Regions:
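A general structural signal for short secondary-structure junctions and capping/turn motifs
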Residues: 2-3, 41-42, 145-147
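Short Gly/Thr-rich strand-loop-strand
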Residues: 98-134
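Bacterial N-terminal signal peptides that target proteins for export
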Residues: 2-11
């Protein structure tokens, strides 16, 4: 379960950076619009599956699936989840999606899991968060991009999430 450990480490890193006093606020509509643009651009591509869920549309089921990796406290405040899964996409589409993730560097605070931005098995991983209250550990937007042998996806969560060290 390398991905599970990766996500846990990412949540802990977000907590550590936030406790250092790095407050970073941004307009949510700009972030949501960037995610919607990526979904619209790649949803019809072969090998790419996009899904957005909100309350009443299966959000609780998605939270249950992510609970082990993200933690119950973190997911409690999530109001929407967008998942872009591209495990069956062509190499060109995978590379294009990696480049699309760069848009978040100007919108959110980036948290690297490793200095080389690579997972132990040679994959690619990046995490981003919009910190709204560093002292309380509150995040309004959270993006995680994973491209490894096990999983290729971009997950975007919005809401009022609380990051606690595990």
């Amino acid at each position: 379960m390398r991905i599970t450990n990766f996500i846990k480490r990412l949540v802990v890193l977000v907590a550590l950076v936030m406790t250092s006093g790095a407050v970073y606020a941004e307009n949510n509509s700009v972030i949501e619009r960037a995610v919607r643009e990526i979904v619209a651009k790649y949803d019809k591509e072969s090998g790419v599956k996009c899904m957005t869920v909100t309350k009443g549309q299966g959000l609780e089921i998605v939270k249950l699936m992510l609970r082990e990796q993200m933690g119950k406290a973190f997911l409690k405040g999530v109001t929407s989840v967008t998942i872009i899964e591209y495990g069956s996409a062509s190499a060109e589409v995978c590379e294009a999606l990696r480049k699309e993730v760069d848009v978040f560097t100007s919108l959110l605070k980036e948290f690297n899991v490793s200095e080389a931005k690579a997972t132990p098995n040679g994959g690619y991983s990046r995490g981003f968060a919009n910190v709204i209250d560093a002292d309380a550990g509150r995040v309004s937007d959270f993006v995680i991009a994973v491209d490894s042998d096990e999983m290729k996806s971009i997950i975007y969560m919005t809401g009022d999430m609380v990051v606690k060290e595990q």
